[in-house]
Amino acid sequence: MKTSIHPNYNDVQIICSCGNTFKTRSTIDKKELHLDVCSSCHPFYTGKQKIMDSAGRVEKFKSRYASFKR
């Protein structure tokens, strides 16, 4: 078996935008990983519908098509 071919497996602190944090292990080189959604705030797991738009895509869409009427 070859030695030293696997990446390092590090402890990582996961931080969600909702404030939830937890620790896991990963091969990334960072100590912290920031997420937009996690299982505590994702609509599938919470059962609540909400628009999750962190990049302003909904507002951009509405402004682009505001002149069109049904």
Swiss-Prot record:
UniProt cross-references to Gene3D superfamilies, sorted A to Z: Ribosomal protein L31
Annotated GO MF terms: metal ion binding; rRNA binding; structural constituent of ribosome
Signal sequence interval, chain numbering: none
Protein name: Large ribosomal subunit protein bL31
GO BP annotation list: translation
TM segment ranges: none
Superkingdom per UniProt: Bacteria
UniProt GO cellular component terms: ribonucleoprotein complex; ribosome
This protein's record includes keyword Methyltransferase: no
InterPro entries tied to this protein: Ribosomal_bL28/bL31-like_sf, Ribosomal_bL31, Ribosomal_bL31_A, Ribosomal_bL31_sf
Complex formation: Part of the 50S ribosomal subunit.
Keyword annotations from UniProtKB, A to Z: Metal-binding, Ribonucleoprotein, Ribosomal protein, RNA-binding, rRNA-binding, Zinc
Keyword hit for Metal-binding: yes
PANTHER family cross-referenced by the UniProt entry: 50S RIBOSOMAL PROTEIN L31, CHLOROPLASTIC, LARGE RIBOSOMAL SUBUNIT PROTEIN BL31A
Cofactor or coenzyme needed: Zn(2+)
Bound cofactor: record note: Binds 1 zinc ion per subunit.
Pfam families assigned: Ribosomal_L31
Function: Binds the 23S rRNA.
Family recorded in the similarity comment: Belongs to the bacterial ribosomal protein bL31 family. Type A subfamily.
Annotated residues for binding of Zn(2+): 16, 18, 38, 41
